[in-house]
Amino acid sequence: MWDPLVHEFPETVHGFRCMLANKYLLAVESKYAPDTLGYELIRDCIGVVRSRNYEQATSRYRDIYTRLQGATEAELQQSVQERCCCPHCPRHKKADMGESAHVQKAHDVQAVQKP
């Protein structure tokens, strides 16, 4: 088990609570498969706890809370059908497949000689 006394200790009570919440969420995360809704929600909660910006964390927590309120325990264990494509989630980014679809490729034009 992780020992908080051996590792760097937070300076504030809030930091200590966040550290404990983070460790607890990491332990709960192992209960869910990586492709389930429960896993995504736990990872999002970890992101909220680790966030240093209060307004951003509050906004993200509201989103998580809304998603969690409508989910049953069985739904948390089910595989996620839609993948999240939000820009702030590195775990959802796919490998770059080359060029973007909206970028046109430049074509070489032969030199035109003047008459």
UniProtKB/Swiss-Prot annotation:
Keywords: Host cytoplasm, Host-virus interaction, Inhibition of host innate immune response by virus, Suppressor of RNA silencing, Viral immunoevasion. Through its interaction with host SGS3, acts as a suppressor of RNA-mediated gene silencing, also known as post-transcriptional gene silencing (PTGS), a mechanism of plant viral defense that limits the accumulation of viral RNAs. The keyword Cell division does not apply. One of its GO terms (biological process) is negative regulation of gene silencing by regulatory ncRNA. This is Protein V2. It is found in: Host cytoplasm, Host perinuclear region. Belongs to the geminiviridae protein AV2/V2 family. Interacts with host SGS3. InterPro entries: Gemini_V2, WCCH. It comes from Tomato leaf curl virus (strain Australia). Pfam families: Gemini_V2, WCCH. GO terms for cellular component: host cell perinuclear region of cytoplasm. Its main location: host cell. It comes from the Viruses.
